[in-house]
Amino acid sequence: MELKNIVNSYNITNILGYLRRSRQDMEREKRTGEDTLTEQKELMNKILTAIEIPYELKMEIGSGESIDGRPVFKECLKDLEEGKYQAIAVKEITRLSRGSYSDAGQIVNLLQSKRLIIITPYKVYDPRNPVDMRQIRFELFMAREEFEMTRERMTGAKYTYAAQGKWISGLAPYGYQLNKKTSKLDPVEDEAKVVQLIFNIFLNGLNGKDYSYTAIASHLTNLQIPTPSGKKRWNQYTIKAILQNEVYIGTVKYKVREKTKDGKRTIRPEKEQIVVQDAHAPIIDKEQFQQSQVKIANKVPLLPNKDEFELSELAGVCTCSKCGEPLSKYESKRIRKNKDGTESVYHVKSLTCKKNKCTYVRYNDVENAILDYLSSLNDLNDSTLTKHINSMLSKYEDDNSNMKTKKQMSEHLSQKEKELKNKENFIFDKYESGIYSDELFLKRKAALDEEFKELQNAKNELNGLQDTQSEIDSNTVRNNINKIIDQYHIESSSEKKNELLRMVLKDVIVNMTQKRKGPIPAQFEITPILRFNFIFDLTATNSFH
């Protein structure tokens, strides 16, 4: 009996097709460059189209070991549990699971409880048939055993190669290339010189000035040296990663971290790590590397220098009232005709909403309006100042009413932190298994670090919100305002001025009330929102004295 007739003999109205690469598929892709997932999709489309029952294909791009590591399959199980499909189609039964026996048990229980038919290109399995059920259990069991044996062989080989100083961590790091005969790293002369330059600038600076990671990145970009991934612009994360990588002193490390049962990543005991010194030719001498690590450990933020991009005074401070987008500085060059017929060039600075173009106001006017606002607070009497701040705090609570309660906000942030830690574990797994290159890992890690930073800022704001019942000390507010304004006028660095404004202001909402008309500039209103710590903390501005 052909496949179509067998399937149609069951009461099936919808079929779910699940596509996933096997380990053999991955190895074939590496050898031949073929796209096995597309090949699998074409096969299943051909099989299921011939059956003439509505179906949907879901494709797992990754290949996780457990159900939790396969988000698409996890979603499939939920759909099957809810009865959206009466059958699941796979290239072979082993595509369903190679995870733990508990995973296999979960799948078997679902197949039996929902009486789900399994469709493969060659056979249909009915969980109500004892013979079919025995075959399903056997194949899932053998898939796990085969996976364990393969992993043991691969792990054993990796340990052996690593102990011999061979490179087994994916792509060769910047400055080296993999010697296919020895499986060890050989220096690439041009890239090695760049690595040496990075260490030299970090330790000794340039032209008598100390250089931060960002300044070094800007310097390499200005020299038009391609990044490890071939891009034009270097970033601070790549610089720091190079400075901390022991591979440049000839050391190879393997199995440094491990994942605990609760999902956290910890450093393995030293006796369990594989560390091979002098595994390949070093690019940096050990003394220079050690000096760099000491400097990194004791590093303090550096002031910007001429090679380093400097933030403007209002960077990240102002928001458009109409669309909620951040406002950015825009500087244009204009030509003015003089009465004597000559021309003169002048520059115009504006603050604009680049995305939606709904706000366009003079930059200096907004800066002055913010400073005037801060000065005006100092002129208010105690009662009016307290009333103004309480009104602002109430508005902040209203703006965050979608969270409804502080408890819900706290729970939301805790859940977000858990999600970020899971992401962190994921990218470390991919990096250590060689799936992520150094550049891709650094890019993902940098993005994740930014999310962690935003999360911490949100926690700080929530803590401030929870403390708003504290009595507002008008003297504290005035003292902090005076320090900020005085220091602002002293500073010549726009970036330091930006730090001062961001210390006191959580946001400044700019509302353009009238567009520019000829020589008459655009009219606007500002709604500043003070930071909680600035209002209540006596030491908020101490770092500037």
Curated annotation (Swiss-Prot):
UniProt xrefs under Pfam families: Recombinase, Resolvase
Ranges in coiled-coil conformation: 19-46, 402-475
GO BP terms in the entry: DNA integration; DNA recombination
Keywords (A to Z) from UniProt: Coiled coil, DNA integration, DNA recombination, DNA-binding
Protein name as catalogued: Resolvase homolog YokA
PANTHER family: DNA RECOMBINASE-RELATED, DNA-INVERTASE FROM LAMBDOID PROPHAGE
Domain of life: Bacteria
DNA-binding region(s) in UniProt: 173-303
SMART domains in the record: Resolvase
